[in-house]
Regions:
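Extracytoplasmic soluble-region selector
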Residues: 2-290
């Protein structure tokens, strides 16, 4: 079979180049990093495919360092780091140029001051001696924009007395902070490194010790943020009670069903609390108007 003509080969190479150009993307168009004086906060940029040479227009604001660099001095991933020495909003443009196609990808790296922090979670309730709850700090700038990462920033997490918890004089003992190293859950790598040196990051686990209400407070440890108000969250610790059967049951008038209440601890049914019967004594009539 004859080799492809030069024009055909050039056309195929052009199509391949256009395909690579169209499909290559960065994982994020803009990244917002917090200003710090001690801790350096990093964020990893990653292209979908290809090998890139990375650069920063203002490395004194946000530097860029290759990750997994090969012999061609290029990488598909790079780490951007906040380096600004001024407590004001500054921007550096990160460029990534594909060494094969020449395609240039762009990401704006913005460094700004943290104005407010809050604690976010999937729920405000957790069950006694059950799976722990993950709590995470979310930081906002003065305009309410959310920072892309707080990786490496040190926080002080403390359990404080809940003065609004009536009837629970020792509510601060209802909760305990659990290290990821003590659990069966996998944290971000930077959290593991911080726990090894007895530091707390933006993500923690909490576990219920006794029923009640408890309050948790988090504060940024870095001195430049001593004016930022601590974030607080109130958690409710409940007994894990299961009603069996747990599904909907439809009964006729004059019939009954037996329920049993079970208590669950550490994923296991500890025993039966009690049985009770539900009797249907009345028939409810409904009318519809058409």
């Amino acid at each position: 079979m004859a080799p492809p003509a030069p024009r055909t080969l050039s056309f195929l190479l052009l199509l391949l180049s256009l395909h690579l150009t169209a499909s290559s993307k960065l994982n994020i168009p803009k990244v917002l990093l917090p200003f710090t004086r001690g801790t350096r906060v990093n964020f990893t940029l990653e292209a979908s495919e290809g090998c890139y040479r990375w650069s920063s227009t203002r490395p004194e604001v946000a530097s860029i360092e290759l990750a997994d660099q090969d012999e061609r001095q290029c990488s598909q991933r790079a780490v951007v780091q906040a380096r600004s020495s001024q407590p004001t909003r500054l921007t550096s443009i990160i460029f990534a140029e594909d060494i094969m196609t020449g395609q240039v990808l762009r990401c704006d790296a913005i460094v700004d001051i943290i104005h407010d922090i809050q604690i976010v979670s999937t729920t405000r309730e957790l069950y006694l001696e059950d799976s722990p709850l993950e709590l995470k700090i979310q930081a906002l700038d003065s305009e309410g924009n959310t920072f892309s990462t707080l990786a490496g920033l040190v926080f002080d997490w403390t359990i404080v007395k809940d003065t609004e918890a009536d009837g629970f004089s020792d509510s601060h003992n209802a909760l305990r902070i659990l290290k990821f190293l003590e659990s069966t859950y996998i944290p971000p790598s930077y959290i593991s490194e911080m726990e090894k040196v007895a530091k707390q990051g933006d993500t923690i686990l909490v576990s219920g010790m006794k029923t009640g209400s408890s309050k948790l407070k988090a504060r940024i440890q870095e001195s430049v943020y001593k004016h930022v108000h601590p974030a607080e969250v109130r958690l409710l610790i409940l007994e894990n009670i299961l009603l069996n059967p747990a599904y909907d049951i439809y009964l006729l008038v004059g019939t009954s069903v037996q329920y049993r209440v079970q208590k669950i601890r550490q994923g296991k049914i500890t025993g039966l609390s009690f049985f009770f019967f539900l009797n249907v004594l009345y028939k409810f009539l409904t009318t519809k108007k058409f």
